[in-house]
């Protein structure tokens, strides 16, 4: 029984990681212009240099968050009401809960195997 649970958790982690990779590629395909470059890695370097780090504001560029150790950070927004009852939206790059759990399981799995 415990092997089935362990296999299920590892399977869900890998499935979540694959989904994140596919989603990142789709977002890049939709958002970026098709650019022909001599260096095939120039776009990847450009994205890495211009990405928004974890816990930084991404209100103006919601798809510009950097990659973490396994997954790309997601831009999460909240609405803030100030003392004058004016509502503003603020966004920051964070690690979603499912991704945190998946990274924890992978780290735990690495400790068990090592």
UniProtKB/Swiss-Prot annotation:
It comes from Lycosa singoriensis. InterPro entries: Spider_toxin_CSTX_knottin (IPR019553), Spider_toxin_CSTX_Knottin_CS (IPR011142). Residues 21-45 form a propeptide. Disulfide bonds join 51-66, 65-93, 77-91. Keywords: Disulfide bond, Secreted, Signal, Toxin. Its main location: secreted. GO terms for molecular function: toxin activity. Residues 1-20 form the signal peptide. It is found in: Secreted. Expressed by the venom gland. This is U5-lycotoxin-Ls1a. Belongs to the neurotoxin 19 (CSTX) family. 04 (U1-Lctx) subfamily. One of its GO terms (cellular component) is extracellular region.
């Amino acid at each position: 029984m415990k092997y089935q649970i362990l296999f299920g958790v590892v399977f869900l982690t890998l499935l979540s990681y694959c989904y994140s990779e596919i989603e990142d590629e789709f977002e890049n395909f939709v958002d970026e212009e098709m650019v022909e470059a001599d260096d095939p890695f120039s776009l990847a370097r450009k994205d890495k240099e211009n990405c928004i780090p974890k816990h930084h504001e991404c209100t103006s560029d919601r798809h510009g968050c950097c990659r973490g150790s396994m997954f790309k950070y997601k831009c999460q927004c909240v609405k803030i009401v100030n003392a004058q009852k004016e509502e503003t939206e603020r966004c920051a790059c964070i690690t979603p809960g499912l991704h945190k759990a998946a990274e924890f399981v992978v780290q735990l799995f690495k400790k068990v195997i090592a």
